[in-house]
């Protein structure tokens, strides 16, 4: 796995530290930065994180703070290639649907298996990106093959129509032999 940049954004410092410790053990070559506000995350987007694990309810300390959905919307505008995994204490289907409609890669409910699900989602993000890179490489290769085929056909047509003396049967038809 290449060096990943992961942002953990949660206003619960203990939750952040536990998740960071878990991910550090589970993911090789990952740089994990912890932020306690959505605003701090948005200010760091120029660092181009691969994955952002974002708490849905970020306004528990400051009522004026952006919530997770607002931060997600800003991330989609400013750094659309970052994959966002929304972490929430809410187990409500309508919230999960809204989050996914707004472009989250996954929605994980805070529970005893949440850290395992976050790890699994991060691995899925990386597998998806690897497949996209492989698909792009395959498309480029197919483009080269098609271009080569077109060049060969063009060469054959040029030879056939413009240089008849190279082809023995055409030489005979043209009375060159």
What do the predicted segments below correspond to?
Residues 117-129:
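Receiver (REC) domain switch/output surface
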Residues 13-33:
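Two-component/phosphorelay signaling modules centered on CheY-like receiver
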Residues 57, 61-81, 98:
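Short amphipathic alpha-helix used as the core "switch/output" element in two-component signaling
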Residues 34-51, 56-59:
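Acidic, metal-coordinating helix/loop segments flanking the phosphotransfer/catalytic sites
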Residues 10:
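Conserved acidic carboxylate
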Residues 66, 70, 91-108:
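Alpha4 helix (beta4-alpha4-beta5 surface) of REC/receiver domains from two-component response regulators
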Residues 136-177:
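C-terminal output/effector regions of signal-responsive regulators
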């Amino acid at each position: 796995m290449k060096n990943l940049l992961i942002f953990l954004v949660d206003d619960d410092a203990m939750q952040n530290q536990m998740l960071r410790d878990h991910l550090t053990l589970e993911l090789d070559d990952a740089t994990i930065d912890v932020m306690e506000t959505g605003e701090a995350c948005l200010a760091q987007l120029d660092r181009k994180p691969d994955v952002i694990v974002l708490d849905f309810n970020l306004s528990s300390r400051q009522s004026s703070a952006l919530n997770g959905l607002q931060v997600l919307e800003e991330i989609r505008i400013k750094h659309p290639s970052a994959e966002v995994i929304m972490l929430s204490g809410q187990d409500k289907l309508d919230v999960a649907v809204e989050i996914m409609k707004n472009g989250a890669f996954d929605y994980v409910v805070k529970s005893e298996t949440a850290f395992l699900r976050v790890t699994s989602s991060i691995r899925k993000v990386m597998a998806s990106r690897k497949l996209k890179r492989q698909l792009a490489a395959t498309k480029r290769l197919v483009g080269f093959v098609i271009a080569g085929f077109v060049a060969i056909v063009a060469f054959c047509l040029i030879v056939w129509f413009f240089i008849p003396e190279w082809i023995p049967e055409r030489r005979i038809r043209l009375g060159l032999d």
